[in-house]
């Protein structure tokens, strides 16, 4: 088995703003009501995101420019490099879409990172998702079952760390060896009795991994 892997959610964990909020704020004001319906459990996560992502109505070059404005935790590129240089593999696990994630990785010249997410593509001025119901990690609610991904990685690595911030992350956190939780995820894991380390940024995560001897200074 390989020694260790670090798996991170993207929106709200690596990035400081969810991509869907950027779309709603700039191009789809009706999405604010849809957001309420989603949070009330009236629509599934994947249906909410599909509707938002198909409401941009912009040329692809402009969409990519907008994606590049998404703020991220500035330390993340350095953190990923440190994980990789210390024998770890870094993965991104997102219930959004890999379309904007790959553009962010390219912007920051982040390499050798596997992205597990819903497949996204540009078509007729919007972002669409290609959901395969026969895929091993398919979820009817999220498009991707994050728990299945963590469980599969646990078969390959001695240690699997996870970082997340919101409800979809509460499920894979159960299976990770240790979860670093931001924002709303902290209370959710508290309620479920799932152990976690409370963090706000990746410098704190790195400090923990240094103290555990996984990353050298």
Q: What is each PLM-predicted segment?
A:
Residues 2-6, 10, 53-56, 60-64, ...:
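Long, low-complexity, intrinsically disordered polar/charged segments
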Residues 1-54:
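Active-site neighborhood of HAD-like aspartate-dependent phosphohydrolases
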């Amino acid at each position: 088995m390989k020694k260790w892997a670090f798996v991170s959610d993207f929106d709200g964990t690596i990035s400081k703003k969810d991509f869907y909020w950027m779309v709603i704020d700039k191009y789809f004001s009706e999405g604010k009501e849809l957001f309420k319906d989603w949070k009330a459990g009236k629509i599934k996560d994947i249906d909410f995101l599909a509707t938002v992502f198909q409401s941009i109505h912009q040329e692809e070059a402009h969409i990519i420019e907008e994606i590049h404005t998404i703020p991220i935790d500035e330390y993340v590129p350095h953190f990923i490099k440190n994980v990789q240089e210390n024998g770890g593999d870094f993965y991104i696990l997102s219930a959004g879409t890999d379309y904007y994630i790959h553009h962010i990785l390219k912007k920051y010249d982040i390499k050798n990172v596997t992205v597990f997410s819903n497949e996204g593509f540009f078509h007729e001025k919007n972002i669409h998702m290609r959901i395969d119901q026969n895929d091993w990690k398919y979820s009817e609610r999220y498009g991707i079952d994050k728990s299945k991904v963590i469980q599969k990685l646990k078969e390959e690595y001695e240690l699997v760390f996870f970082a997340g911030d919101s409800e979809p992350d509460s499920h894979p956190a159960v299976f990770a060896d240790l979860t670093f939780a931001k924002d709303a995820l902290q209370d959710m894991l508290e309620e479920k009795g799932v152990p976690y380390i409370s963090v706000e940024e990746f410098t704190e995560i790195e400090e923990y991994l240094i103290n555990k001897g996984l990353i050298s200074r």
